Each structure stands twice: as structure tokens, then as C-alpha cells.
Design a protein with these regions (language model features):
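Conserved class I S-adenosyl-L-methionine
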Residues: 1-38, 53-57, 102, 148-177
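Class I SAM-dependent methyltransferase "Motif I" SAM/SAH-binding loop
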Residues: 48-52
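A short glycine-rich, Lys/Arg-flanked "PGG" loop and its adjoining helix->strand segment in the class I
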Residues: 131-143
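Core SAM-dependent methyltransferase catalytic element
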Residues: 235-253
Length: 253
């Protein structure tokens, strides 16, 4: 049965923007940083790529870039393959679980890695899994290369009132934007996917594999992530952009 892949991708983008009104600004910062640190023709890993929201923007902004897009979700990967494509060989779609070692060997087939990017994905790894993940990642990125992560990262344990105020302001801002630009929620988008006959097999495979994503958001995760990156061997680590708890963390290898 035919699937309107382009329409599903547009709906995905709309529901993501529903939760992240400043999503495009965050993408802009990440891609600009990529260009400034490793140039305009980088070899990039997109870790937890989903349907390629970031990968597509990277190759559109930096036509000489090559992106190795890795995700464990079979439905979102197929959405990327069908709706985004390989952009003339610039994007390669790979199914692999970042919690396991197999993705590292697959990434090595892409050749030397200048940079790795991730958006709104690594909170699905526990702190222990993150530490192992960063150690493996440090072994892939060339010296002078960069890792850039965009995600919601909580304030520290001794900043609880600051964190609560930031979350309240962020929810208020997101509510205003959602009222001005109505869109499906995350749950509504997935419910619609489940009712699409042409996506039934992929949705069933996804359910059998995941059942539900774990969420390891916790107080202090921003500082904990930076400490794990330093321990893994990254030489410079810091936050380059922040809007409430929405941050871009950068680590130079």
C-alpha cells in the first residue's frame, strides 16, 4: 500500500517543533559550530538520527558534508530513507543500537570521522551507558574533531529553584507557540502512524523492539554529561548555547 512519506515527514517536523519552538535556532547553532571547527566538507555521524531532521539540514547547509545516520528505530529510519533519501550519496542510513558495540564497527566503514552530532536522543541512555558510549565515540572522532549534542539537560542538584523556574517559563513559551501554530503531539503522531495501513509492519516491528523509550532525564545531567566527556578523552567541553534547559553541549577531541 502506498505511503505518502513526504507528508509523514512534514507532520513529524511539525510535532517536533511543537515541543521545541527554538528548534531551528538550535540546528543553526550546531551546524555553524560544525563548520567553524571542522570545515565545510566534514564526515559526520548523526547519532540517534530518527528520520534525518539534522542530517538533512547538515547536507543542505554544507553540500560537501557526508552524514552516517544511525538509529535503532526501524520506522523512523525508513521514513528518512523514503522522504529524505541519500541526497546524492551524501547520507547513509544505518540501523544500529547505540547501547551496543556494533554501531562502532559500522561507523568505521564510513572512514575517518570529523564530527558526531546528536539531538534529543542521548537521554535514552542511562548515565552508565552514556559513559561507555562517549568512550567509544572518542575512539572514533579524529583529534581536533568535535562532538555536538542538542538536548534538554537539567540544572544541577543545587539549582532546583532555578530549574523549576526555567521549566515553567519554557512550558509557558511553548504553550503560546503551540496556540499560534497548532500541531500534533508526540502521542497523536504515533497514534496516527499506528492507524496507517502502509506503516503497520514497521510499527509492529518497532513495538516488538522497544515497547517504550526509557527516559533518564535527572537533575545534574548537564554537568554529569560534561564530566563523562572529559573522562572519555575530550579536551575541551562546554555549553555553547542554551535556552532554559534546552542546550547545545560541545566537546573537542
Amino acid at each position: 500500500m502506498d505511503v505518502d512519506w513526504a507528508s509523514w515527514l512534514r507532520r513529524w517536523e511539525a510535532q517536533q517543533a511543537y515541543y521545541l519552538p527554538d528548534r531551528e535556532e538550535r540546528f543553526h547553532v550546531m551546524i555553524g559550530l560544525l563548520r567553524e571547527v571542522v570545515g565545510s566538507t566534514p564526515s559526520v555521524l548523526d547519532l540517534g538520527s530518527g528520520p534525518g531532521s539534522l542530517a538533512r539540514r547538515v547536507v543542505d547547509s554544507l553540500p560537501g558534508a557526508r552524514v552516517f545516520a544511525i538509529d535503532a528505530d526501524p520506522l523512523l529510519l525508513e521514513l528518512g530513507r523514503q522522504a529524505v533519501g541519500d541526497r546524492g550519496g551524501s547520507i547513509r542510513w544505518v540501523e544500529a543500537d547505540l547501547r551496543q558495540d556494533s554501531w562502532v564497527e559500522l561507523a568505521r566503514t564510513w572512514g575517518p570521522v570529523d564530527a558526531a552530532l546528536s539531538t534529543t536522543a542521548l537521554h535514552w541512555l542511562s548515565p552508565r551507558e552514556q559513559a561507555g558510549f562517549f568512550a567509544r565515540l572518542a575512539g572514533l572522532i579524529r583529534p581536533g574533531g568535535v562532538f555536538v549534542n542538542g538536548d534538554h539537560l537539567s540544572f544541577d542538584q543545587d539549582q532546583q529553584r532555578i530549574g523549576a523556574a526555567a521549566r515553567a517559563l519554557q512550558e509557558e513559551e511553548a504553550g503560546r507557540d503551540a496556540a499560534a501554530h497548532p500541531a500534533e503531539t508526540w502521542d497523536e503522531w504515533w497514534q496516527a502512524v499506528e492507524s496507517e495501513p502502509g506503516l503497520a509492519a514497521l510499527a509492529a516491528e518497532r513495538r516488538s523492539r522497544w515497547g517504550g523509550h526509557p527516559d533518564y532525564h535527572s537533575p545534574g545531567e548537564a554537568l554529569a554529561m560534561q564530566a563523562s566527556l572529559r573522562q572519555a578523552g575530550f579536551t575541551e567541553v562546554g555549553t555553547i548555547w542554551q535556552h532554559y534547559e534546552n542546550r547545545v553541549v560541545v566537546a573537542i577531541r
